[in-house]
Amino acid sequence: MQIIKCLSKLLVFICPFVATAQSTFLPQGDKGYQFMERLEIKEQTNTNLNFSTLKPFNRRYIVEQAEFLDSIYRMGLNGVPDSAGNHLTLTKVDEYNMQSFLMNNTEWVTGAKDGFVSKQPILKSLYLTKPNLIEVNKKDFFLAINPILQLFAGKERGYDELIYLNTRGINARGMISKKIGFFTSITDNQERGPRFAQQKIKDLRAVPGVGFYKPFKTSGVDYFDARGYITFNAAKYVDIQFGFDKNFIGNGYRSLFLSDWSNSYLFLKLNTRIWKFNYQNLFMELTPQYQKTGDTLLDKKYAAMHHLSINLTKWLNVGLFEGIIFGRKNHFEFQYLNPIIFYRHVEGTIGSPDNALAGFDFKANVAHHLQFYGQLMLDEFKLSQIRANTGWWANKWGVQLGAKYVDAFGVPNLDLQVESNRVRPFTYSHFSTVSNYTHYNQPLAHPLGANFQELIGILRYQPAPRWYVNARIIYYTQGLDSLTGRNFGSNPFLDNRTRNSDYGYDLGSGRKAKCFNGQAQISYEVRENLYFDLTAQQRNFKVEGSSQNTTLVTAGIRLNILKRDYDY
């Protein structure tokens, strides 16, 4: 509890300085991310949108950019370029998405809002605006309340049980005097996934993406997911967020730094954006791996992360990352609260007991249609050992390279993405299992852990305003531990001192596993944020001596929530 008391005192100290407008954040997976990503690539030289590596996005900030780009587009329709001589081209579907995006973030829209009003409200008081069940938009107070629903059912070939997900909940966001923002989301869930997802839950002793759960009927799970935060400003360029939720660092489908694949966690985040720089400090309270033993207080561990993003040019953004995972018995290491210092130096000063990582990322927008991106993550390495090429176990690193192509081959609203991820054995692991790069029995970065090579291909196509076609192929190879328990470095939860030797570890060492995971989905937006989904998935997994093939078809509806996927 010491970290909670410390953060509370810090918040009390900062609050008196709150002076400028504050915003909530766009939920991860919101359709607005894909749209803003398209705008960034198509406009190419908008340096404000280039700061998109850190997610979730600040609503106020991205609405400002969307309205600015919308004005450029409308000036271009009249033959007038912007001050830099640029024209922005939007398709009819983009125009629809622009209206939808602004409508879903109405509290920050400065232009006309006539199109946001519902023609047929329910009971004359509900859905007065198209996206929100209840909306209050006054001078010093904003509140939006919406239901959450996800119901799908399907069949897996060769499996008699019904595959299903039943999610019900509510979310609310708001502002007080445009100085304090708040958000909360609560869902109750009952789920039975395909057999490989059921096995994943057994292996992890956790439901991917969520926390505590209970068995439900035959092979199902029951879990409650609650998130929430408050947000405000410490100064004109400094935003502060405190709450229980997730974060993501990267431009790809995966992240080798920090993903949103694990459970939510308590965090304090400071984000400073000024001139060509964006600097984020993230302090987190995490849960180490554990065995379910009934009602008992779980141990704590902690993390501190920095990310500095710089616009080197109007089209090129680079970033530096560092993070530290550490365990103290109910005690935060206060030296890691320093927001402007290299953690590796601090770790060495206090005796090197912790798990430090560093990284580099880049993103380049090219030719108004292409984006190239990547990450290099360094856990530990020695250049001499890399040159020796002996497979030294502690050369622990990961690399990501990817590309996005919008309006591919001249087809409007056809967007393609390809991504490669490679992570060496023993990466993210540590000699102290408390200090490994995990949270609540789940990896903090890539869901596969380590010792793998992965290739991802994604197609997104919106042929008409309310129709969405998505396809995704994931193929990976991984070296798993032997059946006799020999540690080949794929499992970040294991003490890395349990390895059999120091040399001879290459990517894929161990039992050879191969996996193909393909999915196609057609969605229709019945009304704002209400979707009907039809999904087909084929997964073929093979490891030495056994294989598991999954053919899955599901159909369902969802409201104000991202579709739950089984992408591992």
Regions found by a protein language model. Give the residues of each.
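Bacterial Sec-dependent N-terminal signal peptides
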Residues: 1-24
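Short N-terminal segments immediately surrounding and downstream of signal-peptide cleavage
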Residues: 23-40
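Active-site-adjacent bridging/hinge elements
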Residues: 36-39, 238-245, 373, 377, ...
